[in-house]
Amino acid sequence: MREFTLLRYLVFEGKAEAFAGLLYPLEKEKIPNTFSLTDNEKKALWLKIKPALQSDNWDILMEVMFGSKNYPNYGGYTLGVDIIQTAFKNHPEILKTNWTYLDAESFLKLSDYN
């Protein structure tokens, strides 16, 4: 079994939010974890967590995803959604495939976060 790393957690939740947004497009604006950071805050958080993307330390995963004194609230969710959305923007053809099967590393390469 593969480890559940920070990168996999980001993409896992990003996929879930993207799928929900496709099913219920009007509801996605009501979910704070999809837009809780500005572009500058996303960049800063990404630079901070990038060295830990392969970490499977549950404490780090929880802090990044949900927030703590070291990380903004819902920051990991926001980045996860952004990774998926920028992959869709950069490669709209993947929406015509079963994109839910793409792994985290593939989404990262297709996104603006590579």
Regions found by a protein language model. Give the residues of each.
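Pan-zinc metallopeptidase signature
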Residues: 34-35, 46-114
